[in-house]
Protein backbone atom coordinates (compact mmCIF):
# COMPACT_ATOMS: atom_id res chain seq x y z
CA UNK A 1 0.00 0.00 0.00
CA UNK A 2 1.44 3.37 -0.96
CA UNK A 3 1.69 6.36 1.40
CA UNK A 4 -1.24 8.21 -0.18
CA UNK A 5 -3.55 5.22 0.19
CA UNK A 6 -2.43 4.72 3.79
CA UNK A 7 -3.13 8.40 4.56
CA UNK A 8 -6.59 8.18 2.99
CA UNK A 9 -7.43 5.05 4.97
CA UNK A 10 -6.15 6.62 8.20
CA UNK A 11 -8.21 9.77 7.58
CA UNK A 12 -11.29 7.69 6.80
CA UNK A 13 -10.84 5.71 10.00
CA UNK A 14 -10.42 8.91 12.02
CA UNK A 15 -13.57 10.41 10.53
CA UNK A 16 -15.48 7.20 11.14
CA UNK A 17 -14.35 7.06 14.76
CA UNK A 18 -15.00 10.73 15.47
CA UNK A 19 -18.31 10.96 13.63
CA UNK A 20 -19.46 7.40 13.98
CA UNK A 21 -22.20 5.98 11.80
CA UNK A 22 -25.22 8.17 11.09
CA UNK A 23 -26.59 8.55 14.57
CA UNK A 24 -30.25 8.61 15.44
CA UNK A 25 -31.48 12.09 16.25
CA UNK A 26 -34.69 12.40 18.22
CA UNK A 27 -37.43 14.23 16.31
CA UNK A 28 -37.74 17.85 17.42
CA UNK A 29 -40.83 19.59 15.97
CA UNK A 30 -39.73 23.03 17.21
CA UNK A 31 -36.41 22.77 15.37
CA UNK A 32 -38.08 21.33 12.26
CA UNK A 33 -40.34 24.41 12.27
CA UNK A 34 -37.33 26.73 12.60
CA UNK A 35 -35.73 25.11 9.52
CA UNK A 36 -39.01 25.19 7.59
CA UNK A 37 -39.55 28.88 8.33
CA UNK A 38 -36.09 29.75 7.00
CA UNK A 39 -36.72 27.73 3.82
CA UNK A 40 -40.15 29.33 3.29
CA UNK A 41 -38.77 32.84 3.79
CA UNK A 42 -35.94 32.13 1.35
CA UNK A 43 -38.50 30.97 -1.22
CA UNK A 44 -36.14 28.68 -3.11
CA UNK A 45 -33.70 26.17 -1.68
CA UNK A 46 -31.34 23.76 -3.39
CA UNK A 47 -31.50 20.02 -2.78
CA UNK A 48 -28.33 18.00 -3.40
CA UNK A 49 -28.47 14.27 -4.07
CA UNK A 50 -26.08 11.79 -5.67
CA UNK A 51 -26.48 9.79 -8.86
CA UNK A 52 -23.73 7.19 -8.90
CA UNK A 53 -20.66 9.29 -8.16
CA UNK A 54 -22.12 12.48 -9.63
CA UNK A 55 -23.64 15.12 -7.32
CA UNK A 56 -26.99 16.50 -8.51
CA UNK A 57 -28.44 19.81 -7.31
CA UNK A 58 -31.77 21.36 -8.18
CA UNK A 59 -34.08 24.11 -6.90
CA UNK A 60 -37.05 23.21 -4.71
CA UNK A 61 -39.75 25.29 -3.08
CA UNK A 62 -41.93 22.95 -1.02
CA UNK A 63 -41.19 22.79 2.68
CA UNK A 64 -44.03 22.01 5.08
CA UNK A 65 -44.51 20.67 8.58
CA UNK A 66 -46.74 17.60 8.93
CA UNK A 67 -46.97 15.60 12.15
CA UNK A 68 -44.05 17.63 13.53
CA UNK A 69 -41.67 16.70 10.69
CA UNK A 70 -40.22 18.75 7.84
CA UNK A 71 -41.57 17.47 4.51
CA UNK A 72 -40.74 18.14 0.86
CA UNK A 73 -42.58 17.00 -2.27
CA UNK A 74 -41.63 15.74 -5.72
CA UNK A 75 -42.88 13.43 -8.45
CA UNK A 76 -42.13 9.73 -8.80
CA UNK A 77 -41.36 10.26 -12.49
CA UNK A 78 -38.41 12.53 -11.71
CA UNK A 79 -34.75 11.53 -11.46
CA UNK A 80 -34.56 13.04 -7.96
CA UNK A 81 -37.09 10.44 -6.75
CA UNK A 82 -34.98 7.55 -8.06
CA UNK A 83 -31.82 9.12 -6.61
CA UNK A 84 -33.45 9.45 -3.17
CA UNK A 85 -34.54 5.81 -3.19
CA UNK A 86 -30.96 4.69 -3.90
CA UNK A 87 -29.35 7.10 -1.44
CA UNK A 88 -31.59 9.02 0.97
CA UNK A 89 -28.74 11.16 2.35
CA UNK A 90 -29.13 14.76 1.18
CA UNK A 91 -28.07 18.30 1.82
CA UNK A 92 -30.23 21.39 1.39
CA UNK A 93 -29.00 24.97 1.15
CA UNK A 94 -30.92 28.27 1.04
CA UNK A 95 -29.85 31.91 1.29
CA UNK A 96 -31.70 35.01 2.49
CA UNK A 97 -30.74 38.39 3.93
CA UNK A 98 -27.02 37.60 4.16
CA UNK A 99 -27.59 34.32 6.01
CA UNK A 100 -27.81 30.75 4.79
CA UNK A 101 -29.06 27.44 6.09
CA UNK A 102 -27.58 24.04 5.36
CA UNK A 103 -29.57 20.96 6.32
CA UNK A 104 -28.12 17.46 6.16
CA UNK A 105 -30.07 14.30 6.83
CA UNK A 106 -32.05 11.45 5.38
CA UNK A 107 -35.20 11.89 3.33
CA UNK A 108 -37.76 9.18 4.08
CA UNK A 109 -40.59 8.58 1.58
CA UNK A 110 -44.14 8.84 2.93
CA UNK A 111 -46.73 7.61 0.44
CA UNK A 112 -49.73 8.12 2.74
CA UNK A 113 -52.59 10.04 1.14
CA UNK A 114 -52.99 12.29 4.20
CA UNK A 115 -49.33 13.38 4.06
CA UNK A 116 -49.55 14.13 0.34
CA UNK A 117 -52.89 15.93 0.75
CA UNK A 118 -51.48 18.13 3.51
CA UNK A 119 -48.58 19.16 1.27
CA UNK A 120 -50.81 19.90 -1.72
CA UNK A 121 -53.38 21.77 0.38
CA UNK A 122 -50.59 24.06 1.61
CA UNK A 123 -49.15 24.53 -1.91
CA UNK A 124 -52.12 25.28 -4.16
CA UNK A 125 -49.92 25.89 -7.22
CA UNK A 126 -49.00 22.19 -7.22
CA UNK A 127 -52.63 21.11 -7.65
CA UNK A 128 -52.49 21.60 -11.42
CA UNK A 129 -49.64 19.08 -11.62
CA UNK A 130 -50.23 16.69 -8.72
CA UNK A 131 -52.99 14.99 -6.77
CA UNK A 132 -52.70 13.01 -3.54
CA UNK A 133 -54.41 10.06 -5.25
CA UNK A 134 -52.27 9.95 -8.39
CA UNK A 135 -49.43 7.52 -9.01
CA UNK A 136 -46.86 10.31 -9.27
CA UNK A 137 -47.04 12.44 -6.10
CA UNK A 138 -44.63 11.57 -3.30
CA UNK A 139 -43.59 13.39 -0.15
CA UNK A 140 -40.46 12.83 1.93
CA UNK A 141 -39.70 13.86 5.49
CA UNK A 142 -36.36 14.62 7.09
CA UNK A 143 -34.97 12.14 9.60
CA UNK A 144 -31.74 12.51 11.58
CA UNK A 145 -31.39 16.08 10.32
CA UNK A 146 -28.84 18.68 11.37
CA UNK A 147 -29.31 22.30 10.32
CA UNK A 148 -26.84 25.15 10.54
CA UNK A 149 -27.78 28.79 10.02
CA UNK A 150 -24.68 30.87 9.30
CA UNK A 151 -23.44 34.20 7.99
CA UNK A 152 -20.12 35.96 7.55
CA UNK A 153 -20.85 38.25 10.50
CA UNK A 154 -22.06 35.98 13.31
CA UNK A 155 -21.46 32.62 14.91
CA UNK A 156 -23.31 29.72 13.28
CA UNK A 157 -26.36 28.24 15.00
CA UNK A 158 -26.66 24.46 14.73
CA UNK A 159 -29.72 22.44 15.71
CA UNK A 160 -31.12 18.97 15.08
CA UNK A 161 -34.50 17.56 14.28
Where are these regions (language model features)?
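A short mixed-secondary-structure module that forms the rim of ligand-binding clefts
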Residues: 63-96
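Bacterial N-terminal signal peptides
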Residues: 7-16
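Extreme N-terminal tail/first-helix region
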Residues: 17-41
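Positively charged n-region of N-terminal signal peptides that target proteins for export
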Residues: 1-4
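Charged, gly/pro-rich active-site loop segments
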Residues: 20-27, 102-161
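A short, Trp-centered hydrophobic/proline-enriched beta-strand micro-motif
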Residues: 37-52, 90-93
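A mature extracytoplasmic/lumenal domain signature
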Residues: 51, 76, 96, 107, ...
Amino acid sequence: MNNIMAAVLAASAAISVSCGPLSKIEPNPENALKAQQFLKEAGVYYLATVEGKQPRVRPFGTAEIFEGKLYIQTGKKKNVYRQLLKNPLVEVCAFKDGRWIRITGELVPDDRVEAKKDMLDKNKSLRSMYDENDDNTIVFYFRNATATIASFTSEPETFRF
